[in-house]
Amino acid sequence: MDNFDNVLVIDTDGHVYEGNVDLSSRMPEKWRSQAPIRLKDNEGNSRILLEGRIWSASQGPGPGVSGPMTEKARGYRPGMVDPVARLKDMDLEGIDMAILFGTQIALTVNGLMSGELATVLCRAVNEWLLEYCSADPKRLLGVGLIPCQAPQAAVKELEFLAKAGAVTAMLPTNVYGLKNMGDRMFDPIYDCAQSLGMPLSVHPQTGHDGVPGVSGVMGAGSERFFKYVYVHMTAFPFELMIAMMHMIGEGVFDRYPKLRVGFMEGGAGWLPFWAERFDEHIEKLAPQMPDLKRRPSEIIKSEQVTLTCESEETGLDRVFAANSENTVMYASDYCHWDCHFPYSVKDIIDGRDLSFAQKEKLLNKTAIDFFQLKNLPQANALKIARQSWENGNAQKAANA
């Protein structure tokens, strides 16, 4: 049996929960009256009030996280706001480094009508997240938040994030007004990211503000569903497929050949199908995409594109064979309801689809290259986690 104890494990999509943080003190005084207000809906779900609207809607078309769940659904953990607790949970799971996305504000801010408010909130969240990561800067790495509906402000925030040490910045799958990510309005963002050498990470979302067709954070097809289960199943992979398609088709990767973009939390199994389907459409409909200079599959197989897998996902061997062994990265999704804490790393290690070398690429090598990570910690978490798996401490944490 292969020994993974000395393998560095990098989680490329973990989450904090900035919705539980009072951001008002981090906002300029004139904006503090518009700071997010935390509240509970009738089911006890956490929601925020922004721009006079509740995010996300709990009922109606395209609801956010809501409805009954089984005991296997994971709950909120203190590590999402407390970095010391987070580091302990990382040891339980076998994670040496975690790349951290926001949740409630991060997945909302690009749906706001006011680009100015979005800009202020991005800075407030970024400053809090950087402070969170300072608890152990080798192990906790921040994903910056930028106001994409205000591209020039987003450029300034990217420059701030690069100097502050963020390893990537989050892109939504679309922004307020339902602008897709291949739109030329976002070129200043892509130009800046390429110049800085900073990769961008597209992260989908579910839920919206109750105004279908207006909010930029409603997933594809969500307005047709009144149950969260259908919204979640479709929004995450479909929105990534759309964002990737539009960015490729509108020539983003050709205009910016050194730009690197990750597509997070939508699984990986769909990638060979999507590349093949896109190539087929180009053979017959290329005149409709004059800015596309290469076959879509060529771009998807290049170092410009990567994505994350689900820890329990099967069939990754087919993705590696069809695309590249340097395309897919491990992600825990800690600690959202659908994550597999504290067993996501164990899922990868125990999986039968991939060789040891392929799993090592999945767990660290692809992430190191994509995010250009330096100053790596010593691999140690898996040794600790293995003990917790064997002595039952991991199960106790899962049941807590």
Predicted regions and their residues:
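Mid-to-C-terminal alpha-helical segments outside catalytic/metal-binding sites
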Residues: 2-10, 19-69, 73-97, 127-135, ...
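Active-site flanking residues adjacent to catalytic metal/cofactor-binding acidic residues
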Residues: 10-12, 202, 264, 332
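Short active-site segment of divalent metal-dependent hydrolases/proteases
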Residues: 16, 206, 336
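Short glycine/proline-rich turn/loop motifs
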Residues: 62-77, 107-112, 225-233, 304
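Active-site-proximal gating segment of KS-fold condensing enzymes and close homologs
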Residues: 116-132
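Catalytic pocket-lining loop regions of alpha/beta-barrel enzymes
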Residues: 120, 133-141, 146, 151-152, ...
